[in-house]
Amino acid sequence: MKIKLEIKRLPHGANLPFPSYASEGAAGMDVVSAEDVILQPMQRYPVKTGFAVAIPNGYEIQVRARSGLALKHGIACPNAPGTIDSDYRGEVKILLINLGSEAFEIKRGDRIAQLILASVTQAVFCEVTDLDDTQRGHNGFGSTGI
């Protein structure tokens, strides 16, 4: 299934590719940086992409790290997956953190993250006095194994 997304190029996004799928079976669209940045170890930074997008109601865009950057350099999205809500119209920025031990240079045009379009189901809470019993019950963290 394909969903149409309206995208607005911002002035500092000139000549950059819009997010795109690297292969036919890819779930995530690669997104590139619209600026040069040097991320120091443990530094967090919202990297500009040079575009804004109109996401249809009932959808979100999830922001996830690129596996190669995470494996080779420790570059991650600290709030992964990040969420871009359907009512947001500002510039898409990618929050990155350098978990590596060396400074990491991002150049304008470098692929920095993946964007995944996902459907959203909103919950409606109904207060009750009791919940049904399950085998797991109140057992929390680590209760099903490590």
From Swiss-Prot:
Gene3D superfamilies: 2.70.40.10
Catalytic activity field: dUTP + H2O = dUMP + diphosphate + H(+)
Cross-referenced InterPro entries: dUTPase, dUTPase-like, dUTPase-like_sf, dUTPase_trimeric
Top-level taxon of the source organism: Bacteria
Regions that span the bilayer: none
Cofactor: Mg(2+)
EC code: 3.6.1.23
Alphabetized UniProt keyword annotations: Hydrolase, Magnesium, Metal-binding, Nucleotide metabolism
Signal peptide per UniProt: none
Known pathway: Pyrimidine metabolism; dUMP biosynthesis; dUMP from dCTP (dUTP route): step 2/2
Keyword Isomerase: no
An example Gene Ontology molecular-function term: dUTP diphosphatase activity
Name of the top EC class for this enzyme: hydrolase
GO BP terms in the entry: dUMP biosynthetic process; dUTP catabolic process
Binding of substrate, residues: R66, S67, G68, N79, T83, I84, D85, K93
PANTHER family per record: DEOXYURIDINE 5'-TRIPHOSPHATE NUCLEOTIDOHYDROLASE
NCBIfam families the record matches: dut, PRK00601.1
Family under the similarity heading: Belongs to the dUTPase family.
Function (record text): This enzyme is involved in nucleotide metabolism: it produces dUMP, the immediate precursor of thymidine nucleotides and it decreases the intracellular concentration of dUTP so that uracil cannot be incorporated into DNA.
UniProt name for this protein: Deoxyuridine 5'-triphosphate nucleotidohydrolase
Biological source species: Zymomonas mobilis subsp. mobilis (strain ATCC 31821 / ZM4 / CP4)
Gene name tied to this protein: dut
